Amino acid sequence: MIRSVFTRDKPGTSDPAVGEALADAEMKFGNDIPTGTYLDMTANLPIVDPLKIKSPLLIVRGEYDGIATEVDLINFYTKLTVSDRQFIILPGLAHSLSLGLNRELFWHTMQAFLDMPPRVDSFKNG
């Protein structure tokens, strides 16, 4: 299961050794897991109500992500009521953005979002 996350969407977007290392590290906790919550999550996306989100939001999707389609995420994005929001599609990445070969694109995007200066709502003449 864990190994397949790195090969399921677009083989070649991550180093196979990363998937192997992660799977090996996780295997010490056992080699079987209940699928209920995972299947529930993927079958019932989205798992949050976009109308209830009030904080700044960054949605990042890898070009080859096989979990949620671009259309799924755009539909979610357009339902958001928070004005401080961004939607980014990163090229050359699949679902595991932070572990892919092009992970620097993900980390750059995250840093830019977190470093975004606050919004100015009005000019005050001093």
Would you name each region that the model predicts?
Residues K54-D65, P91:
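Conserved strand-to-loop "acid loop" that flanks and positions the catalytic carboxylate
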Residues S83, D115-G126:
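Alpha/beta-hydrolase-fold serine-hydrolase catalytic core, especially in secreted/extracellular enzymes
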Residues F87, L93-W107:
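Catalytic histidine-centered segment of alpha/beta-hydrolase-like enzymes
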